């Protein structure tokens, strides 16, 4: 009996985590919109193989009109709205956006809850087209709307 109790004690957190993971993936799959807040970021500039990274201010935006069948969505912020291409997998949504100047924006929203915030874990990368090359990586959460 004691052995069985120990086995259940060890397995129970795994069962809870699996159930939580399934719920997070369902939340992601059913989201028609996501409000994303990226509080932590780092920006990197480099020239001639010399890299300089520094912290960067965070930001937020909303991904609306998510259509997994067509594979697209719309990014909406205070600066306006833009078209996004989307790759929809059961456990993640990748949103890709391009600016007129050639910058690439990639946002990945995971079917995994942030334990302290309750939202879905997310990252946002910006790859600037200008020279010298500049990139930034943002970390945060997205809440389904």
Cite the ranges covered by each PLM segment.
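Sec-dependent signal peptide recognition
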Residues: 2-8
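N-terminal signal peptide c-region/cleavage motif recognized by signal peptidases
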Residues: 13-18
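Short, intrinsically disordered, charge-biased short linear motifs at domain edges
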Residues: 19-26, 125-132
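Short, solvent-exposed loop/hinge segments that bridge or flank secondary-structure elements
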Residues: 25, 30-72, 106-112
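Edge beta-strand at a domain terminus
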Residues: 55, 127-145
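Short, surface-exposed coil-to-beta transition loops
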Residues: 58, 104-110, 121-123, 134-138
